[in-house]
Each structure stands twice: as structure tokens, then as C-alpha cells.
């Protein structure tokens, strides 16, 4: 039997781009509205994705990074969440140590092997939330991922990181044309006079990769995280709930078209 797990890596070059918020909400929406079995993996040492679903690791409980370094059973650290159809591998308090190890000779294929061998039969979509940097943890995620979603905000320093992500992908042998699913823009203000300038800069680097749906600035996003739930469950009529649901459908449609294209190429 052929399984069709699709691994999405949410990434950014700097913090404050809405990366973790999108990882959480898109994952929950895929399960709730599209019936997908979703695994979230928190690779960010800040552990915000884990906290946002009430799944923070406490005490001496092992996390992803310790298990990978020790070559232990990764499935033992998958946790259920209160969201139907959504499981999570929480971040670990030893994330910083793993980040150091992973740049000094630790093989960068463990996560990919884990996804292929164990997760493929159990999940339809895996979403990996990466650190806002291009270190060892991000490299591990990029190698393991099928598609990348680059998270940006319409500000100069956020946009400047695009070229670095492109160079990073090339350095690990993953051309951006094949591996970037799209660019997601958050904290969007339709009234801003600089919108087109930022759009033009992004298009000059990643042509035709910007998602049609922009996530508008909305306080309900941070408020929903405090309640450890998705924004559409807590504030269903908010513009953030509408925007992220639309983005979820856009992502799903692209994944389906990419999967059909890949399958047809394999059968030629």
C-alpha cells in the first residue's frame, strides 16, 4: 500500500512573522474542516506551538531532539491534543543543545526516516514549525519536508531574509522552484501604500509563489493562543478566522494538485 503523507515546513528567517500561529491554525483547520489526520512537530526552541495547544513538556520528559540524538523510539513522544485529528510532538527544553549537536556531525536524515517509516500510515499531513533561523534544526526540517511555506510580514527585515532562505535551500540540494509551496503574508494591512513594493520584491525572488490569501492584523489571533485553541473555534466570526480558513483551503488545493502531478509523473 502506498501512503501519501505530505510534510509541510513552516519557516522564516526572523521572528514575529506569524509562523507558529499559522502552523497551529492551518493544522487544526486541516483536521476540523478537511478531515485530515494531522501531526504537528515543534522544532522551535521557544516551544510556542506546543504551548499554544497545551502540550508543553515538563520535568524530565524526553522531547524530539533527545530521542533523535539517542536513536530511540520517536513514536513514544507523540502526544494527543484536545483537537480531534491533531497530534503533536512537543518541543523540548533541550532544543538548544540539539541545535548545537545537529551542526556538528549528527546525521540529518532521522526525521525523514521517522516520517516515512512510522507516520505515513497514521497521518495525512505533517506540519513542522521551525526556529526563525537557518541552523541545524531548520536544516533537519528542510531535508525532511516535502514542501515549504515561507512566512513573512510586510516589513524590510522580513523580506530581506528571502534570499538567505533561497541560498540555504540550494546549499542542501533542494531547489526552491520545486520545494516552496508558497509565501504566506501575515499582519497585512490593505490600506498600506507600500504593499505593492513588497509584493514586487517577493515576486522578483519567488515568482508566482505568494498565496492569494493574506492574513490581516487581528488581536483575536493572540487571544486565541492564550485559550490554547484555534482562532476559528474561539472567534469564529473574526477576520483572522476567515483569512486562515481561506489560506488552509488554498494550501490544500495546491497540495492536491502537486500530489496528482507527482503521481502522474511516477506512473509515466
UniProtKB/Swiss-Prot annotation:
Cysteine disulfide links: none
MF GO annotations: ATP binding
CDD domains: ParAB_family (cd02042)
InterPro entries associated with the record: AAA_dom, DNA_Partitioning_ATPase, P-loop_NTPase
Keywords: ATP-binding, Nucleotide-binding, Plasmid
Alphabetized Gene3D superfamilies for the sequence: P-loop containing nucleotide triphosphate hydrolases (3.40.50.300)
Residue numbers binding ATP: 13-20
Protein name (database record): Virulence plasmid ParA family protein pGP5-D
Amino acid at each position: 500500500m502506498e501512503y501519501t503523507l505530505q510534510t509541510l515546513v513552516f519557516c522564516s528567517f526572523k521572528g514575529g512573522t506569524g509562523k507558529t500561529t499559522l502552523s497551529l491554525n492551518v493544522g487544526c483547520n486541516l483536521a476540523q474542516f478537511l478531515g485530515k489526520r494531522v501531526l504537528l512537530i515543534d522544532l522551535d526552541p521557544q516551544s510556542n506551538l506546543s504551548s499554544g495547544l497545551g502540550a508543553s513538556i515538563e520535568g524530565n520528559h524526553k522531547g524530539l531532539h533527545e530521542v533523535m540524538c539517542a536513536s530511540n523510539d520517536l513514536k513514544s513522544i507523540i502526544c494527543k491534543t484536545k483537537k480531534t485529528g491533531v497530534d503533536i510532538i512537543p518541543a523540548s527544553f533541550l532544543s538548544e543543545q540539539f541545535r548545537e549537536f545537529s551542526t556538528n556531525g549528527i546525521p540529518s536524515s532521522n526525521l525523514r526516516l521517522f516520517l516515512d517509516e512510522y507516520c505515513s500510515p497514521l497521518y495525512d499531513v505533517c506540519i513542522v514549525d521551525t526556529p526563525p533561523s537557518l541552523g541545524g534544526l531548520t536544516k533537519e526540517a528542510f531535508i525532511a519536508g516535502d514542501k515549504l511555506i515561507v512566512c513573512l510580514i510586510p516589513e524590510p527585515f522580513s523580506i530581506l531574509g528571502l534570499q538567505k532562505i533561497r541560498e540555504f535551500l540550494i546549499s542542501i540540494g533542494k531547489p526552491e522552484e520545486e520545494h516552496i509551496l508558497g509565501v504566506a503574508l501575515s499582519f497585512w494591512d490593505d490600506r498600506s501604500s507600500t504593499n505593492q513594493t513588497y509584493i514586487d520584491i517577493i515576486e522578483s525572488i519567488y515568482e508566482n509563489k505568494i498565496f492569494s490569501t493574506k492574513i490581516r492584523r487581528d488581536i483575536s489571533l493572540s487571544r486565541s493562543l492564550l485559550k490554547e485553541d484555534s482562532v476559528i473555534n474561539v472567534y469564529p466570526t473574526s477576520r483572522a478566522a476567515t483569512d486562515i480558513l481561506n489560506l488552509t483551503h488554498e494550501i490544500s488545493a495546491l497540495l492536491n494538485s502537486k500530489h496528482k502531478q507527482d503521481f502522474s509523473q511516477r506512473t509515466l
